[in-house]
């Protein structure tokens, strides 16, 4: 398996990087746990390079475009979770920012381990631009999960037409929606796949089509209905 992986690297990684990778593998072939983490992170980096290239061409397809509907509530959530600095214009630390990414994704799925490419929109919404790969998962405390559940209820209560819907119902109809995220004129544009019942979006009382927070360098424009 390691041999096959190495052959793949030789075909896809620049020559100057191969020596560093070879040195690491030689030193850690007896530590399978650490080597596994290294390979996972390396694969994520390669996947993200592909995504970055796609952004400049045709955009990147995502499956959680509906997360933009609740984006306006995320700064409040991050503050209550204690992730933000005192002036609320940024995160206290990289650890808090990573937690914010995984907390955002909890509105999409309860899965704990999430491939980094699936977190692309959450990274945009949290202003995460570090080249360092994200961990496979991020454990959230019970009080953090409880605050997320409270926010789910608040979103449903504030959206009059969806007030009697379960969160699972909202997930299947709006949150887990396909879209294409693209960089246009130095800002983000998200074009969301439309469905017949998107007429309900007109009843949302808050803005979700232009998203900008203090920690986001670029505006996210949402094209949806």
Language-model segments: what does each one mean?
Residues 1-225:
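Short, compositionally biased pre-sequence/patch detector
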């Amino acid at each position: 398996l390691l041999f096959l992986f190495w052959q793949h690297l030789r075909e896809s990684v620049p020559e100057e990087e191969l020596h560093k990778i070879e040195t690491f593998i030689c030193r850690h072939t007896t530590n399978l746990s650490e080597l596994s983490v290294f390979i996972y992170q390396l694969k994520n980096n390669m996947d993200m390079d592909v995504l970055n290239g796609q952004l400049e061409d045709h955009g990147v397809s995502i499956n959680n475009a509906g997360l933009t509907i609740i984006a306006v509530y995320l700064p409040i959530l991050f503050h209550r979770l204690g992730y933000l600095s005192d002036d609320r214009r940024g995160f206290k630390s990289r650890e808090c920012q990573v937690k914010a990414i995984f907390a955002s994704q909890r509105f999409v799925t309860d899965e704990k381990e999430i491939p980094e490419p699936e977190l692309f929109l959450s990274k945009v919404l949290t202003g995460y631009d570090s080249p360092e790969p994200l961990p496979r998962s991020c454990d959230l405390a019970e009080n953090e999960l409880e605050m997320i559940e409270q926010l789910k209820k608040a979103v449903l209560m504030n959206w009059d037409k969806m007030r009697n819907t379960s969160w699972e119902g909202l997930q299947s109809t709006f949150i887990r929606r396909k879209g294409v995220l693209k960089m246009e004129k130095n800002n983000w544009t998200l074009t969301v796949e439309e469905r017949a019942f998107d007429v309900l979006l007109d009843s949302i009382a808050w803005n979700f089509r232009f998203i900008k927070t203090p920690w986001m360098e670029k505006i996210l424009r949402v094209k949806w209905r």
